[in-house]
């Protein structure tokens, strides 16, 4: 009877020991499995995040590449407009310098005429279709030439001034049209950039949702 009792106690102790050992081994295996699953999920999440970032980068490059060329084109057009404006200003400045020079020459001619007319000479001039004569001022050929040159200079000055003003007005109109076109292109580009920013923000929100969980 005692042997049976001893065997029962021994079996019970052995069973408890084995059960405890199995329980510990099961807990260890479950902990290892949990760690492996968490590590696999973490690696999978990192890989998915990297793939999404890479895809987003490729999409951004694909979207912004045409607009990059547009931006470069707009910048080049802006530089051309600025260069054209400087050229127009330089041309008008040269025209004004020439006009000033011609005006100075005209003033010198007037001074010469004034000097020559201080000592007026009177003479008898014949009356047209008559044998009678009348008193008139003797006019030298050089004075007549100077008057003709003065009139010619004045006409040239007015013509060149009108030409310069017309050219400047046309150039300013062209620059205004180009500035309007540039403003429209920049507004379109800004709207597209804002739309792409909203898309990236939504993608970031979608990307961060699994991490929050």
From Swiss-Prot:
It comes from the Bacteria. This is Cryptic plasmid protein B. It comes from Neisseria gonorrhoeae. Plasmid pJD1 is the smallest of the gonococcal plasmids. Its function is unknown. InterPro entries: MbeB-like. Keywords: Plasmid.
């Amino acid at each position: 009877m005692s042997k049976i009792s001893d065997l029962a106690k021994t079996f019970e102790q052995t069973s408890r020991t084995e059960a405890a050992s199995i329980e510990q081994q099961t807990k260890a295996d479950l902990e290892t499995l949990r760690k492996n699953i968490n590590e696999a999920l973490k690696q999978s999440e990192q890989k998915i995040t990297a793939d999404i970032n890479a895809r987003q980068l490729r999409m951004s490059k694909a979207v912004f590449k045409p607009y990059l060329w547009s931006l470069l084109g707009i910048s080049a057009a802006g530089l051309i407009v600025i260069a054209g404006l400087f050229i127009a200003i330089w041309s008008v400045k040269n025209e004004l310098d020439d006009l000033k020079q011609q005006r100075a020459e005209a003033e010198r001619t007037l001074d010469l005429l004034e000097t020559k007319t201080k000592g007026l000479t009177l003479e008898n001039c014949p009356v047209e279709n008559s044998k009678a004569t009348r008193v008139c001022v003797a006019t030298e050929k050089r004075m007549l030439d100077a008057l003709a040159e003065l009139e010619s200079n004045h006409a040239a000055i007015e013509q060149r001034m009108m030409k310069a003003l017309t050219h400047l007005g046309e150039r300013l109109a062209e620059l205004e049209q180009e500035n309007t076109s540039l403003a429209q292109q920049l507004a379109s580009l800004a709207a597209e950039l804002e739309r792409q920013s909203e898309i990236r923000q939504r993608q970031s929100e979608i990307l961060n949702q699994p991490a929050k969980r």
